[in-house]
Amino acid sequence: MTLVLNQTEQLTSGLKAMGVKLAEVQQAKILRYLELLHKWNKAYNLTAVRDPVLHVSRHILDSLAALPYLKGVQFLDVGAGAGLPGIPLSIALPESHWTLLDSNGKKTRFMDQCRMDMGLPNLRVEHTRIEAFSPDVKFDGIISRAFATIGDMIAGCRDLILSETRIYALKGLYPHDEIEAMPADFEVVEWHKLEVPGCDGERHLLIIARSGNTGGS
């Protein structure tokens, strides 16, 4: 079985198991992303997952697991790395707008190449550190699956977090210690245990907001 056929079947069955419906053109873009990731990863070490057969479950389905819980139009992916979860989510939500931020030049060049190659007009890439980032838009949601801790994420993004902004933190095991160490002016307003086909181990999504701003969550 060729790699492309393997990934296509994994993607189709995984989306069905998760109840995520994507048009053929959206699935084609995701498969093209996987092709680019496999190609660039050989030279630039974009992801520690070296086996491309695992990229569908570990990267694509894992990213899309957050899809049912996202609310808003403007999103920021902090520490986007190889474009995860931002690129899969921007493909799945073409009416939304995504800013993908990373301080690693190789990774932002890869994300820019994906944006141009795949035709993703709702995507912009920023090569900078979060502390130096001065956006010209207000974000409804700030998401990350790679930022060190929830506390670090809040500290870095604090100036961007408005009363209505939601932080979406994708984690493995439920991070009890990180939650206990969160700043007092923030709280977990929702949390969800995620089921990701093909992924071993637990996955959780935590939705965090400024304390006292839980309406509409």
From Swiss-Prot:
Subcellular location, principal: cytoplasm
Q: Which InterPro entries match?
A: rRNA_ssu_MeTfrase_G, SAM-dependent_MTases_sf
Protein role: Specifically methylates the N7 position of guanine in position 527 of 16S rRNA.
Binding-site positions, S-adenosyl-L-methionine: 79, 84, 130-131, 145
Please provide the record's keywords in A-Z order.
Cytoplasm, Methyltransferase, rRNA processing, S-adenosyl-L-methionine, Transferase
* Entry-linked Gene3D superfamilies: Vaccinia Virus protein VP39
Q: Where are the transmembrane segments?
A: none
A Pfam family hit: GidB
Reaction(s) catalysed (UniProt annotation): guanosine(527) in 16S rRNA + S-adenosyl-L-methionine = N(7)-methylguanosine(527) in 16S rRNA + S-adenosyl-L-homocysteine
Q: Which GO terms describe its cellular component?
A: cytosol
Query: Under what name is this protein listed?
Result: Ribosomal RNA small subunit methyltransferase G
Q: What is its EC number?
A: 2.1.1.170
Q: Which organism is it from?
A: Hahella chejuensis (strain KCTC 2396)
The enzyme's first-digit EC class, named in words, is transferase
| Domain of life assignment | Bacteria
Family according to the record: Belongs to the methyltransferase superfamily. RNA methyltransferase RsmG family.
Molecular-function annotations in GO: rRNA (guanine-N7-)-methyltransferase activity
Cellular location of this protein? Cytoplasm
